[in-house]
Amino acid sequence: MNQNFPDDGELIKATERKSDKLIFFVHFFQGHKKALKRHVEFVNELGYDAYIFNLKDRAKQHSYIPYSTVSKKFGMKHALADQIEHHLDLLSDYNEKIMFAFSNVAGCAMETMARRFKNHPHEIQAMICDSGPGAKFIYSSYKLLQEQFGMKSLPLRIISTPVIALGWSKELHKDLHEHLKQFPENFPLLSIRGWRDKMISPSHIDDVFEPHQNINWKKLSLPEAGHLNGLRDFPSEYKPALADFLQSIK
């Protein structure tokens, strides 16, 4: 099943392949490829091959100075964009791919895609963003410390928030608009969000996409969902919408 991909990469093939397109997954910040097991199983059921790998999203994996050798920028966002691009290069057997990215790491995937559209204009046919990215990165950095990392001390959260945010990117996601301007006209994108998301507000996600008329984007709004729990807790809403979107990509 697996070739020798770096970063524990796995190419997981559908039992009955019905599409030539590969679903390329990028997990959420400081997550793990195993967290996407349900997503991979579902797209396999639909007849799509899937690819997953582990991000190098800990500062120590970059000697505490994450840096992009492509964009020449410091910050975890830009370093992860390089890693994502490297894995895309390893999958040249698949001429067409669909990007499926989670939370604010979807912004890293957008950075990679904006670069690649120049030389690989037909490679990435569509994008799915689950629970992100958000336009207000300082806010989501604060909520990351509170909700995901469980930091209870208010003074410590206030001190740590700018460290986390600027360690991600000094652009603080203002560069997402420049990335999206590079996307092709009428580019298909599905934005999945939970109305009860405590980390990235749906309105902050809308702020990313609404200015861009070249993006043909659709929303899947889950009124009872929080951050990243749509497929796990609300499969009856999540699965049909995802299947319909994928099947619309010809």
Language-model regions, residue ranges each:
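Alpha/beta-hydrolase fold nucleophile elbow
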Residues: 92-103
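Serine-hydrolase catalytic core
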Residues: 161-243
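Catalytic nucleophile-loop/oxyanion-hole region of alpha/beta-hydrolase
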Residues: 57-91
